[in-house]
Amino acid sequence: MTDSPRLYSGMQPSADSLHLGNYVGALLQWKELQAAHDAFFSVVDLHAITVAQDPHDLREKTRRTAAQYIAAGIDPSVSTLYVQSHVPAHAQLAWVLSTITGYGEAARMTQFKDKSAKQGAEATSVGLFTYPVLMAADILLFDADVVPVGDDQRQHVELTRDLAERFNSRFGETFVVPQAMILKDGARIYDLQSPESKMSKSADSGAGIVWLLDEPDIARKKIMRAVTDTDGVVSYDRAGKPGVSNLLSIYSALSGRAIQQIELDYEGKGYGDFKKGLVEVVVDALGPIRERTLELLADPAELDRILAGNAARAGEAAEITLAKAYEAIGFLQPTRR
């Protein structure tokens, strides 16, 4: 426990590797935020099973995601980095919160409406419907003051705030009412082949996705083949030049240099030179992450030790909040012997 503001965030273990969009859009910013926050970062495997998962693959993806968190700079001795299912209080609090969530309230969640419309009623699980309630439990368990999320998750944080205020009003002050911390606008990375679409593991083609664990030569080929346009001018114009603008955003995020500076560097030069420069930046940034991830995966006992220690720390914090909620709602608590 520190005097720093409490922060909670997480990502699903939904692929063998996280991608560049995950890194720039979340991990890179988490790394910066952990220095000034009492941070809890979770691999949210309970959320992952709202769609069908192969059990062996889920375990492997969970381990690989945790390793990439660490390799990308999340320090498990500074932040609490754990696997969601290792802390049973997540599911316990989610049930309590579901009893004060209105059906219409849950049905209005945009992500549920979009995904259920694509999948159809028969293929849509109750778990997907109640996903935002579990997310609320994730946040409220740790008395999070701030929740760094993309703009597409803002609605879920608003629901979390509503549930916290509703519970507090009915049962007495129990939960901290969190604030959404919307991540930087420039942090959204788009598909290299379809730069109008966000980089996503569910893309039709893997050619537009740079994975953190891609070998350098694979990453180079993807960048050199990235969609641009025909005018040959390296300049940022999200509406008119989405492909080049996306590459400039990547260059800026990974190099720490302003887009305007990069534009000046490549003034009068073609896209070939620009892409070659970007390849160097990407390989320099992602190479150490790939190497460290592979080291961690080669020593599963050490990775398990880290995760177990952090889960114990997370569990202690979560149990305090859960006990307060149980007491407030009127559950008969077991007698300690």
Curated annotation (Swiss-Prot):
The keyword ATP-binding applies. ATP binds at Q12, P13, S14, G21, N22, G150, D151, D152, I189, K198, M199, S200, K201, S202. It is an enzyme of class 6 (ligase). It holds the Pfam family tRNA-synt_1b. It is found in: Cytoplasm. GO terms for cellular component: cytosol. The lineage of its organism: Bacteria, Bacillati, Actinomycetota, Actinomycetes, Micrococcales. A motif ('KMSKS' region) lies at residues 198-202. The keyword Cytoplasm applies. It comes from Leifsonia xyli subsp. xyli (strain CTCB07). Homodimer. SUPFAM superfamilies: Nucleotidylyl transferase. Its EC number is 6.1.1.2. Belongs to the class-I aminoacyl-tRNA synthetase family. It catalyses: tRNA(Trp) + L-tryptophan + ATP = L-tryptophyl-tRNA(Trp) + AMP + diphosphate + H(+). A motif ('HIGH' region) lies at residues 13-22. L-tryptophan binds at D138. Catalyzes the attachment of tryptophan to tRNA(Trp). GO terms for biological process: tryptophanyl-tRNA aminoacylation. Its main location: cytoplasm. GO terms for molecular function: ATP binding; tryptophan-tRNA ligase activity. InterPro entries: aa-tRNA-synth_I_CS, aa-tRNA-synth_Ic, Rossmann-like_a/b/a_fold, Trp-tRNA-ligase, Trp-tRNA-ligase_bac-type, Trp-tRNA_synthetase. This is Tryptophan--tRNA ligase. Keywords: Aminoacyl-tRNA synthetase, ATP-binding, Cytoplasm, Ligase, Nucleotide-binding, Protein biosynthesis. HAMAP family: Trp_tRNA_synth_B. The gene is trpS.
